[in-house]
């Protein structure tokens, strides 16, 4: 599984967890996989890592929102931000610009017209604080 695909699956897993409020991370990951597709370590680390660091990640996002509340952001955008912020804070081997570009590309696919710019702005602000 390519890293872009893993990031997309991680975003989808966090989306499911946000909607249901009770899905276990491994179940959410399994729900995103195509038939016969296997998970990988990168995908699982993104989802489990977010769950283990949810408060820190959400606070980093909150501190960089202007005139928005985290709870009012679309679930898709919130999920993309959460995956990207986890990656930026805890996966130091991945350059921040790569993470931001990947998040923007995922937003183009899954978000609305404004998602791409919104996500770029928030992540750029967070990058400056790390």
From Swiss-Prot:
It comes from the Bacteria. GO terms for cellular component: cytosol. Keywords: RNA-binding, Transcription, Transcription antitermination, Transcription regulation. GO terms for molecular function: RNA binding. Pfam families: NusB. Coiled coil: none annotated. Involved in transcription antitermination. Required for transcription of ribosomal RNA (rRNA) genes. Binds specifically to the boxA antiterminator sequence of the ribosomal RNA (rrn) operons. Belongs to the NusB family. This is Transcription antitermination protein NusB. The gene is nusB.
């Amino acid at each position: 599984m390519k890293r872009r695909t893993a990031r997309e699956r991680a975003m989808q897993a966090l989306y499911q967890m946000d909607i249901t409020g009770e899905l276990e991370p491994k179940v959410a990951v399994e729900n995103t996989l195509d038939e016969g597709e296997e998970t990988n370590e990168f995908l699982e680390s993104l989802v489990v890592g977010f769950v283990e660091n949810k408060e820190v990640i959400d606070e980093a996002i909150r501190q960089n929102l202007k005139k928005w509340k985290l709870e009012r952001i679309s679930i898709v955008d919130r999920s993309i931000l959460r995956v990207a912020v986890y990656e930026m804070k805890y996966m130091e081997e991945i350059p921040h610009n790569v993470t931001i570009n990947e998040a923007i590309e995922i937003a183009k696919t899954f978000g609305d017209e404004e998602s791409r710019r919104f996500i770029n702005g928030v992540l750029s602000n967070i990058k400056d604080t790390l």
